[in-house]
């Protein structure tokens, strides 16, 4: 708005990448609350767009997608899409979820207090909660979870590269795989 006011004035709709795919597949202008939680425009606790944040950001509600829970059906394939893909037009399109919320569901991190830590390009700690909560130290973000509950999440960049640093600088080895072998054994047989 400040740097490119002409472009800001032309914004008709605001979508996240997965939501654009849902739009192209079904024609539904929508998002899910887990992904919308990271847009700074969502009242996470109440799972609705925040009037206060829309006013601060000068965004109108009609520019924002309709909100769904992650598992909710948002539509079916448009006939021309179904024909092009060779699918039935009855194929349902669901709202989906943000990447970390979807990963948490996939790893079973859905119970109250369960924690998931992932290391990759970023490092993420994800704590599921049946109730909305706010970290008073502002170290963790409050989000809607894909299973209808909430979660606290913290992220940092370059997380997996920390493993390399740890192995080389602290453990004085370049064989990170050998260093991790005893840890891997702890996870065998569902232990």
Placement of each model-derived feature along the sequence:
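Nucleotide/phosphate-binding loop and acidic/charged catalytic motifs
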Residues: 32-36
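Active-site core segments that coordinate phosphate-bearing ligands/cofactors
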Residues: 1-29, 40-51, 55-56, 79-191
């Amino acid at each position: 708005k400040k740097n490119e006011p002409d472009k800001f004035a032309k914004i008709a709709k605001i979508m996240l990448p997965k939501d654009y795919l849902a739009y192209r597949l079904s024609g539904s202008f929508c998002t899910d609350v887990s992904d919308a939680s990271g847009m700074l425009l969502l009242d996470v606790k109440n799972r609705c767009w925040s009037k206060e944040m829309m006013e601060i950001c000068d965004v109108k509600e009609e520019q924002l997608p309709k909100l769904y829970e992650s598992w909710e059906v948002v539509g079916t394939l448009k006939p021309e899409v179904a024909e092009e893909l060779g699918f039935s037009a009855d194929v349902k399109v669901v709202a989906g979820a943000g990447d970390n919320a979807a990963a948490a569901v996939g790893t079973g991190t859905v119970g109250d207090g369960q924690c998931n830590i992932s290391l990759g390009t970023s490092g993420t700690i994800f704590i599921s909660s049946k109730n909305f909560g706010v970290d008073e130290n502002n170290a963790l973000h409050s989000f809607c979870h894909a299973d209808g509950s909430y979660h606290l999440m913290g992220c940092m960049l370059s997380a997996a590269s920390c493993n390399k640093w740890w192995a080389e600088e602290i453990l004085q080895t370049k064989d990170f795989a050998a260093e991790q072998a005893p840890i891997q054994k702890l996870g065998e047989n569902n232990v």
